[in-house]
Structure formats: C-alpha cells, structure tokens
Design a protein with these regions (language model features):
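Asp-based, Mg2+/Mn2+-dependent phosphohydrolase catalytic module
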Residues: 223, 230-264
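Short active-site oxyanion
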Residues: 36-40, 60-61, 146, 206-207, ...
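Conserved acidic, metal-coordinating active-site core of Asp-based
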Residues: 95, 99-211, 215-223, 232
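Asp-based phosphoryl-transfer active-site loop
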Residues: 2-17
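Active-site phosphate-binding/coordination module
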Residues: 18-120
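Short, structured coil segments at secondary-structure junctions
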Residues: 57-59, 66-67, 166-169, 223-224, ...
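Residue-level signal for inorganic ion chemistry
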Residues: 32, 43, 67, 147, ...
C-alpha cells in the first residue's frame, strides 16, 4: 500500500523514554516526507508542548493536539478548536474534587492547576511548560480545551466509570497514560481529527497509517488503513492493531516507516 498520511503519537510512541526523538526515527520521518508522504502528530499534549518536536522535524501539516480538541499548524494557523463547555467543565471538576486527585485545566494553550502537588510538578517537567495557578472551578472563566486528572491507575479507572455513568455523552473520557485521565469535548478524539484531516486532503482511509501506544489512540488506530501499535503499547491496543512494531525505546516508529513506507 502507498501510504499518503501518517499520524504519530508522541509520548511512549515516537519519543524515547528520555523524551527525545532518535536519529533513526528522525531520518525515517524526513525520508518519508521527501518521498511525498504527509506526516503529522496526534497527541494528547498541549500544542505548545508538541510544537518543538514538529519544528525539529519540519512538519508542515496541521498538528492534532489535546487528543484532537485543537488542530493547528506549526506556524500558528488554527484549523479548529473544540473546547469543553465551561459549565460542563465546572461540573466535572466539582464531581472529581472529593476524590482528592490532581486536576489540570488548559485554557488558551496555558496550563492551570490549584496547587503544585507532586503529580503537578512531575507533569510540568514532562510537558516543559509554565504553570499558572487558579482556584478550580471558581476562577475558571473560559471553556477549557480539556481537563486532565492525575492519580493512581486503579482510582482513575473507577472514577472513569462514575464519570461515564453521570455525564453520559456530554464528555469524552480517555486514559492517555497509566496515571492520566483526560476529559474533553465529546467529538475531541484523535480518530475524529485524523478522519477530518484525511478527508480535507482527499486521502482515502486505506492510505492512512496511525501509530500509537495507549487507549487514547484506539479510535485512530481503528480508523487508519494501517493501525500500528508500538511494542510497549497496552495489550488492548495491540489486539486491535494491524501491525505491532518494536517499542518506543527500540525505534518502533522508525522500523514500521522504513519497512512499510520507504521500502514500498
């Protein structure tokens, strides 16, 4: 198959465990772009946190960020923004606060939290973005792009079930990492964003490749003509993927691009 569009997750997929892009992956991506294949990111990261990696690779396609809630070019042109309704966001935060979990809110591509908890400090060090503080939800005045809840995996799994039961289809709930539970606009998913991007470029579904590692990648892996799970992906994602490559630290992304795009 001649793949014309590749969407790649960042954390635990393209990025190594030290949060860098390997030289081999860099070469493979740039070679595929030179061949005429379009490449973008599909990440839960903030736009400003994903942007340095896009600039490093010279990507000129819209970047799918915030799990699909914000799609924006590296030069700043916005394709669309689907934030969480302010009243729903406040209701979610009030629902979650009694559980004592860390909460992040994202407004205008800025990170807000109430306190510099250990979870908050760790997140900020990974994202490499400034932290702003506000009382949540009282000081929340604008629709947030998403809400992120951080805590122990089992607690988040139980909370997700309760949120789903209470809010039904008013929100999208996804687990992006073991300790990250993300709440966003119901249509803000990587799969929806990738589908809209492919259609805007007149690229057929079977000509799309998507590469990821966790359950927030599930709908884009299902949508793509070739859904790839890296070797360190969760088992549920591996089970539905068309291809399972090596792990993020063993150049799984580079391997699949070399074998399925560059050699095609």
């Amino acid at each position: 198959m001649d793949y014309k569009l590749i969407a790649i997750d960042l954390d635990d997929t393209l990025l190594k465990n030290d949060l860098t892009i390997s030289e081999r992956a860099r070469r493979a991506i740039k070679a595929s772009i030179s061949k005429g294949t379009l490449v973008t990111f599909a990440t839960g990261r903030m736009y400003r946190s994903a942007l340095p990696y896009a600039l490093e690779l010279g990507l000129d396609l819209p970047l799918i960020t915030y799990q699909g809630a914000l799609v924006k070019y590296a030069d700043g042109r916005e394709v669309y923004h689907r934030p969480l309704d302010l009243n729903i966001a406040k209701e979610v935060i009030n629902f979650v606060k009694p559980f004592g979990l860390h909460i992040n809110a994202y407004i205008d591509d800025e990170l807000y939290m109430e306190d510099a908890t250990d979870w908050g400090k760790k997140y900020a060090s990974i994202a490499k973005v400034p932290v702003h503080f506000m009382q949540l939800p009282r000081e929340l005045k604008n629709d947030p792009t998403k809400i992120l809840i951080i805590g122990e995996s089992e607690e988040l799994d139980q909370l997700a079930l309760k949120l789903q039961k209470y809010f039904l289809e008013a929100i999208n709930i996804t687990k992006s990492k073991e300790h990250f539970l993300e709440i966003s606009h119901p249509r803000a998913t990587k799969g929806n964003a990738l589908k809209e991007l492919a259609e805007s470029l007149n690229i057929k579904r079977e000509q799309v490749m998507a590469i990821g590692d966790n359950m927030n990648d599930l709908d884009m892996i299902k949508y793509a003509g070739c859904g790839v799970a890296v070797g360190n992906a969760v088992e549920d994602l591996k089970n539905i993927a068309d291809v399972v490559s090596k792990s993020n630290d063993d150049d799984g992304v580079a391997e699949v691009i070399e074998n399925m795009v560059l050699k095609a």
